[in-house]
Amino acid sequence: MANTPHGGVLKDLLSRDQPIRGELLKESETLASILLSERQLCDLELILSGGFSPLEGFMNEKDYNGVVNDLRLADGALFSMPITLDVSQEDIDELKLKAGGRYTLRDFRDDSPLAIITVDDIYRPDKAVEAKKVFRGDPEHPAVKYLYNTAKEFYVGGKIQAINKLNHYDYVGLRYTPAELRQEFGKLGWNKVVAFQTRNPMHRAHRELTVRAARSRQANVLIHPVVGLTKPGDIDHFTRVRVYQALLPRYPNGMALLGLLPLAMRMGGDREAMWHAIIRKNYGATHFIVGRDHAGPGKNSKGEEFYGPYDAQKLVEKYKDELGIEVVPFQMMTYLPDSDEYMPKDEVPEGTKTLDISGTELRKRLKFGLPIPEWFSYPEVVKVLRESHPPRAKQGFTIFLTGHYNSGKDAIARALQVSLNQQAGRTTTLLLGETVRSELSAELGFSREDRHKNVQRIAFVAAELTRAGSAVIAAPIAPHEAGRKEARETVEQGGNFFLVHVNTPLEYCEATDRKGRFAAAKRGEIKGFTGVDDEYEVPSNADLVVDASQTQVRTIVHQIILLLESQGFFGN
C-alpha cells in the first residue's frame, strides 16, 4: 500500500476538475492570460498533479511567509520551499491583476491554456529575507541569483483549477503523475518503496547503493530522476534517461521501477531535501534516500561549500515523524577490486585496497575517449554516455576572433577555414562580421545595445552549429567585454569556445585602412565606430593573443591549430 499523501489527501487537481473542464476551457478564452516561464511550468505541473500536495495553487502571502520563516504553511503543515508565481508591475497594470480576479495560466511554448488562477493576493516579497532564510544568502547561490536577477518583484497567490495537462513529447510512458504511480505500485503489489532522487547518470555504485537500501528494508526501488530544471552544466535529461533505461535490467528482476519527475530544482540543500521527501511521499514512496550534500550547488568562487555535507540528512531526520517518510542516509560506496564488490566506505576494513573514479576523472575520460572500467560503470551505460558526449576529436568548437576593424580578423578567419577543411572530419562555417551584418543583423545600428544584439545572434548560431559538431569561425569586432562573456557562456552550454584577441595596434589598423572607414568616422560620417568614438574593451580572458602587424597570417593560423591540437581536437 502506497504512503499517505502529505496533508492526508492527494490534491490531484486534474482529476478533481475534469468534470467541469469544458466550462473552464470556455471561460479561459475570456480571461486575461499570464504566460508561464519554464520554471513556472514545472511548478504548475506538480501543483496540478498533486506532487506538491497539500498545495492547491501558488502560495499566498501567509503561506509564503510561514514557509520562509518557519518551514510551515499557514495551517501548520510542514513545507520547506516557497512555490510562487512572480509578476512585474507591468504585468499587474497590463493584465489588471487584482485580488479576486481570475486569470488564465498559459504555456509559453504553444500558448495553450493550462489552468485558471483565482487570485488571493498580490504581494511584494522581501527577497533579502527569502535569500537568507531559504538559501542562506550567499549571492553566488544559483537560487539567490535567480531571485535577484530573474524573478519579478511581485508574487501572485491563489488557488488553481486545472484545464489541461502539460504536453510532453519525450518519454511519455515514464511520466507518471502521483495518482498513476500509486496505481502502478498497487498493480505490482509494492508496499514499501525506496525512492532515489538523482540529476546525474547512474553507475554501478548507485545500483549497489539502491539495491542494498531496498534489501535491508525488504522494499522495492523507485528510480525517480529530475527531468525539469537542474543545475546548469548537468548532463541533459535525454541522455540521463537513456542511461537509467540501460541500467534498469541490471537490477534483480522486479525490484526497480523508473519514473520521471518534472521538477524545477532550486539546489536548496537541506530545505530542498525536505521538499524532495514531501514530493516522494506524495508519489507513494515510504522511504527516501537523502545523499551527502543533497541538492547542493557545489562550491562558490572561494571554494566554499554552500551547505554542510550532512545538513540535508539532519533536517529531514529532525522532521521525519511529521513528514511520514523514512530517511535512508546515502552511503558512499567504494569498489574493492580483490573481492570484486562494492561496499559502504565506513564498512571497509582498514588496509583494504579500494578504487574510485571521481566525476572530474569520468568527464576527462569521456572527453578524451579514454577507457572507463567495467567495475565503475556497465558497458551499456558507457555506450549511451559516449554517444551523447563524443571525445574531443569528434566535438565541435567555435573560434571567436575579436579585434579592431581592419585588424586582420577576416584574413585570419578565411585562412583558418581552409586549414580546418584540410583536417577533415568536421564541417566548417565562417561568420565574418560584415556577412553577419548584412544577412542576420541588417536592421541593427552600432549603438552599444545593437552591438550586443549582433554578438548575441552570432553566439546563438555558433552554439547551434558547435553543438552539432561543426567548427565555427566567428570574426566580429565584438568590442565589449560583457558581450564576449555572454557569447562564451552561450556556446559553452553545448560545446567548446576559444577567444582569440587579434591585438593589432589601432594605429596600424588605421594606417592600412584602404577603404577609408577610420577617416570617415573621424569626419563624423560614421557614428559609433570602434576606436574613434566607441571604446574597444581589451579582453581579460583571451585563449590566444595575436598581432597581425607583427606576425604573418600563416603563422597565426598555425598557432590556432596548435591550440586546438593541444586540447585534443584532432585526435591522439
Swiss-Prot record:
Top-level taxon in the UniProt lineage: Eukaryota
InterPro entries with a match to the protein in the record: APS_kinase, ATP-Sase_PUA-like_dom, P-loop_NTPase, PUA-like_sf, Rossmann-like_a/b/a_fold, Sulf_adenylyltr_euk, Sulf_AdTrans/APS_kinase, Sulfurylase_cat_dom
Site, as annotated: Transition state stabilizer: 203, 206
Ranges for region Allosteric regulation domain: 395-572
Pathway where it operates: Sulfur metabolism; hydrogen sulfide biosynthesis; sulfite from sulfate: step 1/3
Residues the entry annotates as binding ATP: 197-200, 291-294, 333
Entry GO MF terms: adenylylsulfate kinase activity; ATP binding; sulfate adenylyltransferase (ATP) activity
Chain residue ranges for the region called N-terminal: 1-169
Positions of sulfate binding: 197, 199, 295
EC class name: transferase
EC numbers, comma separated: 2.7.7.4
Protein name, as recorded: Sulfate adenylyltransferase
Source organism (scientific name): Yarrowia lipolytica (strain CLIB 122 / E 150) (Yeast)
Lineage, broadest ranks: Eukaryota, Fungi, Dikarya, Ascomycota, Saccharomycotina
